[in-house]
From Swiss-Prot:
It catalyses: GTP + H2O = GDP + phosphate + H(+). Residues 174-176 are annotated as: G5. This is Elongation factor Tu 2. Residues 136-139 are annotated as: G4. Residues 81-84 are annotated as: G3. Its EC number is 3.6.5.3. Belongs to the TRAFAC class translation factor GTPase superfamily. Classic translation factor GTPase family. EF-Tu/EF-1A subfamily. Mg(2+) binds at T26. Residues 19-26 are annotated as: G1. GTP binds at residues 19-26, 81-85, 136-139.
Length: 394
């Protein structure tokens, strides 16, 4: 069978394996690459290649992550797998690996375990939109009723955290048997790949989303007006369009009268580009770093939100001591720090370095935010934590 060459035209989807320690996440990752390479072409990756995950830094936090790639006939997948539970927590909170969908691995021999629940909750908090279940080690369970029971438990757990438990694809398989080349179990890996293709919708590309540019710098150019610079995070801004300036102060409207990149004039700025945007009638002192330029009505400023945060351990250069309620650090959003106060969950007195925790934050100035926005927690310019907006309150 001839191997197809990698087509850049295929939609690109980001996924990852999540689930309890030793339920077979890494074995499944190896099995997917192996079976799909054999079936559709591409590179197989061995278990020990994946298990030996390199360390990366995201927002000053060290995370071990393995990245593999595989293809189905219709899509190209980038897949992340983490060796340790702490790596998952950090990865999901920092958004180091944005997932369009996740494969939840549950050993049929054990059923749902504490980290199964924690990973589903994290998925909900950080905005993983779709979860597919792979019931692993099914070759070791002879009793059909037991499999039914485990499947039911997993579906109920998903529903508890507002995932559609009843409609979630659940594939029963054995990653190890598939990896060993047993055709009956290889077929289950193909079934999983087909579920990825059909159940996870094609992600909306950044360029198709509403325009947003976090402002990094502001200049005034005599005779031409005020220019803001930054990297377009999403969408497109065209010359002549109205834009809003959102965050820190009251929202104002203005018009984009020019876009330039590397001193050349353009008619638009697109997602991923570093541009200068010329604004009509806006004075230099009415706009500042930390605000965003956005398509009118697409994003609102907020001060209060629920978040999921990871507090760096001492070894990661974080705090050496716990903090308590009333803690007032800076919250770094996109390009600027804003001071905020925290409220800890009922019954939690203190937070230790290395913990992950849900907390309610109230900022002293509003920031343009949506659910899923990432931030760093800093003290005097040094990062002590990372977080994600789980729910906007006010």
């Amino acid at each position: 069978m001839s191997k197809e060459k990698f087509e850049r035209t295929k939609p690109h989807v980001n996924v990852g394996t999540i689930g309890h320690v030793d339920h077979g996440k890494t074995t499944l990752t190896a099995a997917i690459t192996t079976v799909l390479a054999k079936t559709y072409g591409g590179n197989a990756r061995a278990f020990d290649q994946i298990d030996n995950a390199p360390e990366e830094k995201a927002r000053g936090i060290t995370i071990s992550t393995s990245h593999v790639e595989y293809d189905t006939p219709s899509r190209h997948y980038a897949h992340v797998d983490c060796p340790g539970h702490a790596d998952y927590v950090k990865n999901m909170i920092t958004g180091a690996a944005q997932m369009d969908g996740a494969i939840l691995v549950v050993a049929a021999t054990d059923g749902p375990m504490p980290q199964t629940r924690e990973h589903i909750l994290l998925g909900r908090q950080v905005g993983v939109p779709y979860i597919i279940v792979f019931l692993n080690k099914c070759d070791m369970v002879d009793d059909e009723e037991l499999l039914e029971l485990v499947e039911m438990e997993v579906r109920e757990l998903l529903s508890q955290y507002d995932f559609p438990g009843d409609d979630t694809p659940v594939i029963r398989g054995s990653a190890l048997k598939a990896l060993e080349g047993d055709a009956e179990w290889e077929a289950k890996i193909i079934e999983l790949a087909e579920a990825l293709d059909s159940y996870i919708p094609e992600p909306e590309r950044a360029i198709d989303q509403p325009f947003l540019l976090p402002i990094e710098d502001v200049f005034s150019i005599s005779g031409r007006g005020t220019v803001v610079t930054g990297r377009v995070e999403r969408g497109i801004v065209k010359v002549g369009e109205e834009v809003e300036i959102v965050g820190i102060k009251d929202t104002t409207k203005t018009t984009c009268t020019g876009v330039e990149m590397f001193r050349k004039l353009l008619d638009e700025g697109r997602a991923g580009e570093n541009v200068g945007v010329l604004l009509r009638g806006t004075k230099r002192d009415e706009i500042e770093r930390g605000q965003v330029l956005a398509k009118p009505g697409s994003i609102k400023p907020h001060t209060t939100f629920e978040s999921e945060v990871y507090i760096l351990s001492k070894d990661e250069g974080g705090r050496h001591t716990p903090f308590f309620k009333g803690y007032r650090p800076q919250f770094y959003f996109r390009t600027t720090d804003v001071t905020g106060t925290i409220e800890l969950p009922e019954g939690v007195e203190m937070v230790m370095p290395g913990d992950n925790i849900q907390m309610k934050v109230t900022l002293i100035a509003p920031i343009a935010m949506d659910q899923g926005l990432r931030f760093a927690i800093r003290e005097g310019g040094r990062t002590v934590g990372a977080g994600v907006v789980a729910k906007v309150i006010a």
